[in-house]
Amino acid sequence: HFIFVVEGVLMYFYEKQVRQLLTRLADRFSGSEVWFDVCGPMMANSKYIKPDSLRGHEAQIRSGLKDGHEVENWEPRLQLIDQALYQKFFPKRWGLGGRLMGLFPGICKKFSSLLGYKIKSLRPVFVRGHPHHLFKQTA
């Protein structure tokens, strides 16, 4: 089993490409975990709000999401472990404004968060000795 950490990468890809990557990881690495950061819709859709790392660069954020459970709909083998808010990490870095914003998770998720997923296996359900078209999730 592996832990994949994909930090600062996926937001630069289109949603379709992110979905493909997550499906390929789920195909090959059952029982593993994948962690990645996402930009929320406020950051992904804004020309004016950018992460510090993009200021002065032409790179574009191409995808973003607010709710980590959305990924479970894309790929049913991914089970959300946590959607962590950056305001919980290193509170002194964020200052008073960031700490206050951290009290409102819904607002924070509009900008960015860290998502962690367990990759579960889907095994076929057998009906009368033949694989059924539906799959049963296993941990």
Cite the ranges covered by each PLM segment:
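Alpha-helical subdomain
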Residues: 1-123, 139
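Short hydrophobic transmembrane-like helices used for membrane targeting/insertion
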Residues: 125-127
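Intrinsic-disorder-associated, low-complexity terminal segments enriched in Asp/Asn/His/Tyr and depleted
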Residues: 130-133
